[in-house]
Swiss-Prot record:
Belongs to the Integrator subunit 14 family. Mg(2+) binds at residues 10, 12, 86. The lineage of its organism: Eukaryota, Metazoa, Chordata, Craniata, Vertebrata. Component of the integrator complex, a multiprotein complex that terminates RNA polymerase II (Pol II) transcription in the promoter-proximal region of genes. This is Integrator complex subunit 14. Component of the Integrator complex, composed of core subunits INTS1, INTS2, INTS3, INTS4, INTS5, INTS6, INTS7, INTS8, INTS9/RC74, INTS10, INTS11/CPSF3L, INTS12, INTS13, INTS14 and INTS15. The core complex associates with protein phosphatase 2A subunits PPP2CA and PPP2R1A, to form the Integrator-PP2A (INTAC) complex. INTS14 is part of the tail subcomplex, composed of INTS10, INTS13, INTS14 and INTS15.
Length: 518
């Protein structure tokens, strides 16, 4: 899951720290030392993590947008200036903005707040923000809890005794409470020094950034793998005394199911499954990063020559169009499948079902599934016209199906521009034009974005007025027809806003080629 590091650069972070030796340190230097340690660990063991760096005092600034380049993040740590007073609320508002712009409100995110425990002074201080928390309007609400799933880790460049001498610790604990209790406060044990700062950040790494290694098994075949992001324990709400359930480190494949049968099931989370190659001495050579490029290339070459069950499984699932059912724990299952990342690249993914003996109703109980060879006759029928499962979903979804994503403005802009490009090439691109138009129409109706339909209709009418004299007469009719259909759908009338309805091309008698026109 993405990480936002929020660094306090107010004047209080420049307070000197008495450290053994002649060199003078500030609390800011201790924080930079700890973050450098964190970034080095993530570059080696958590390199798929997207991380952003935000600095704040009375205002906030995005120093490094979300990236996997940890060298850039470490360079930014040495380029931070000192500013004025602390205002935590503005920093938390900044975190809300950058996370929602990049990832939306559904992706879990970890926020690492590095500060010295000073709450600021006057209006804008954390004391003032918490004191007025219950007196705010909805338009001026406090940024916690975050509008996305999150965990807030507060790294204090102060020891517990210093924080308890004021109300700083109570206010910081209130932040965790406001974030639905998701997070933790870390303080320096003992005097402020580099060693104790390393120990504090080491606790954060152990808690939140330890890679999840497991053994993937299928019969006698095994493979060491890393599951990313790390699966979080799941708490069953129905239990009287809920106990977090964690997945086993032994992931055993219990069978294979056709991808058409498993359809598009509800899942708790999705994870990459990455093989961990071992060299001849038994040491790991992947998926970490080595310092020397030549050593890295040679290690990858060695790893590429060693047979790996995880690679075999990935290729087999991709070719056969099947998924592997994997047991995560007692009465807890998931599935392994190949997901295309691009036309030439795909990844082995693992999705976690909800715990229980029957996570997918249309498959029945997992424990009662068996191989086709045990059946007296082909359960799918001789012509593949029936199913052995008790309940079939109405619509079977394909994992290769293109999904309309408008998380960023650029995604919506691209889809609209695609329609306009095809509109200028009518009637040759009639089929493509209506295909893209219906895709945008369905997405707009699904999101309740009716104003978009009105806006695209206006654009099509404008394109109609800009057609050159040499344009085919059918183009004007098709553009006018499409614009009218979108305007009708934008009114919200039920008979015109059916999701399954498609706008069909207008039937005309115009010839389609220049030869026919002559």
């Amino acid at each position: 899951m993405p990480t936002v590091v929020v660094m306090d650069v107010s004047l209080s972070m420049t307070r000197p720290v008495s450290v053994e030796g002649s060199e003078e340190y500030q609390r800011k230097h201790l924080a930079v030392h700890g973050l450098t340690m964190l970034f080095e660990h993530m570059a080696t063991n958590y390199k798929l993590e997207f991380t952003a760096l935000v600095v704040f005092s009375s205002l906030w600034e995005l120093m490094v947008p979300f990236t996997r380049d940890y060298n850039t993040l470490q360079e930014a740590l040495s380029n931070m200036d000192d500013y004025d007073k602390t205002c935590l609320e503005s920093a938390l508002l900044g975190v809300c903005n950058i996370v929602q712009q990049e990832w939306g409100a559904a992706i879990p995110c970890q926020v690492v707040l590095v500060t010295d425990g000073c709450l600021g002074i006057g209006r804008g201080s954390l004391r003032h923000s918490l004191a007025t928390h219950n007196q705010r309007s909805e338009s001026n609400r406090f940024p916690l809890p975050f509008p996305f799933p999150s965990k807030l880790y507060v790294m204090c460049m102060a020891n517990l005794e210093e924080l308890q001498s004021t109300d700083s610790l109570d206010c910081l604990e209130r932040l965790i409470d406001l974030n639905n209790g998701e997070g933790q406060i870390f303080t320096i044990d003992g005097p402020l020094c580099l060693k104790n700062v390393q120990s504090m950040f080491g606790k954060l790494i152990d808690l939140a950034y330890t890679p999840f290694h497991a053994v993937l098994k299928c019969g006698h075949l095994t493979s060491d793998v890393q599951v990313f992001p790390r699966p979080e324990p799941f708490i069953i709400d129905e239990e009287i005394d809920p106990i977090p359930k964690a997945i086993n480190t032994d992931l055993e494949i219990v069978g294979f199911v056709d991808i058409a049968d498993i359809s598009s099931p509800p899942v708790l989370s999705r994870h990459l499954v990455l093989p961990i190659a071992l060299n001849r001495e038994g040491d790991e050579v992947g998926p970490g990063i080595t310092d020397d490029t030549e050593d890295e290339n040679s290690a990858n070459q060695i790893a590429g020559k060693i047979p790996n069950f995880c690679v075999l499984l990935h290729g087999s699932l991709k070719v056969e169009g099947m998924v592997a059912v994997v047991q995560l724990g007692p009465e807890w299952y998931g599935m392994l499948y190949s997901q295309a990342d691009s036309k030439k690249k795909s990844n082995l993914m693992m999705s976690l079902f909800e715990p229980g003996p029957e996570p997918l109703p249309w498959l029945g109980k997992m424990a009662q599934l068996g191989p086709i060879s045990d059946a007296k006759e082909n359960p799918y029928g001789d012509d593949d016209n029936k199913s052995p499962f008790p309940l079939q979903p109405k619509n079977k979804r394909s994992y290769a199906q293109n999904v309309t994503v408008w998380i960023k403005p650029s995604g919506l802009q691209t889809d609209v521009q695609k329609i306009l490009r095809n509109a200028r090439k009518l009637p040759e691109k009639t089929q493509t034009f209506y295909k893209e138009l219906n895709r945008l129409r369905k997405a707009a109706l699904a999101f309740g974005f009716l104003d978009l339909l009105k806006g695209v209709a206006d654009m099509l009418e404008r394109e109609c007025t800009l057609l050159p004299d040499t344009a085919h007469p059918d183009a004007a009719f098709q553009l006018t027809h499409a614009a009218q259909q979108l305007k009708v759908a934008s009114t919200g009338a039920s008979e015109y806003t059916a999701y399954d309805h498609n706008i069909a091309p207008l039937q005309t008698d115009f010839p389609t080629t220049s030869t026919e026109r002559m």
